[in-house]
């Protein structure tokens, strides 16, 4: 690949990292957006690499959670009281419990989902369906007080239920954060508790999923060139830096606002994607 072309590929990686850093945490589907953006940016790489790339760059976004919440998530943090250490371990146990459903169904259905549901029409439908769900749930939520307003008081059973909602995010266009935040609100948590738990749940979930994708990539006989590694690294670092801002933005945003605006965005985007997919199918 010529130098000019390679620089363009790196610039594309930066843009994709920005998209990942924004959409991983907002309930609007990061994978769905990456699939769409790749249509227009068209990374000059193999399909196997792009499929792996779309998942593995999420590690950069996940690292941002670990940096922002390091003290809260670290049971060995100096200065923590015995009670705080206990609560930290309990939090991690809740995260592990919530991971069980998606780990089971993810391993079972990942290949089938990728083969049959990674297309414009599925992404469009999921964008619209969950957009409507967010608007409806938030409208209902105005008349219902949340039962859980403190993550420390969230039960293990509630954590498991949220984990069941995370299974829905296996379908492209759903949004992992969208499914778990929506699930948290449905089972009675406040928006802030649902968002916090979504961030923490992302750590083992996305590390596991990214690792699975990377392993499959190499098992299928693919290799990673130095240029591809650089593209992956640039996108991941960009996703990390953007995520640092977006996570803080979202936590401040939900103190005064609900998720209705994201529901409306999903519906509009879903209609656009559906139209684009139809045009592409008809005219090629």
From Swiss-Prot:
It is found in: Cell membrane. Pfam families: BacA. InterPro entries: UppP. GO terms for molecular function: undecaprenyl-diphosphatase activity. It is an enzyme of class 3 (hydrolase). It catalyses: di-trans,octa-cis-undecaprenyl diphosphate + H2O = di-trans,octa-cis-undecaprenyl phosphate + phosphate + H(+). It comes from the Bacteria. The chain crosses the membrane at residues 6-26, 49-69, 89-109, 117-137, 167-187, 192-212, 227-247, 259-279. Keywords: Antibiotic resistance, Cell membrane, Cell shape, Cell wall biogenesis/degradation, Hydrolase, Membrane, Peptidoglycan synthesis, Transmembrane, Transmembrane helix. Its main location: membrane. GO terms for cellular component: plasma membrane. It is a multi-pass membrane protein. One of its GO terms (biological process) is cell wall organization. Its EC number is 3.6.1.27. Bacitracin is thought to be involved in the inhibition of peptidoglycan synthesis by sequestering undecaprenyl diphosphate, thereby reducing the pool of lipid carrier available. Catalyzes the dephosphorylation of undecaprenyl diphosphate (UPP). Confers resistance to bacitracin. Belongs to the UppP family. This is Undecaprenyl-diphosphatase. It comes from Streptococcus thermophilus (strain ATCC BAA-491 / LMD-9).
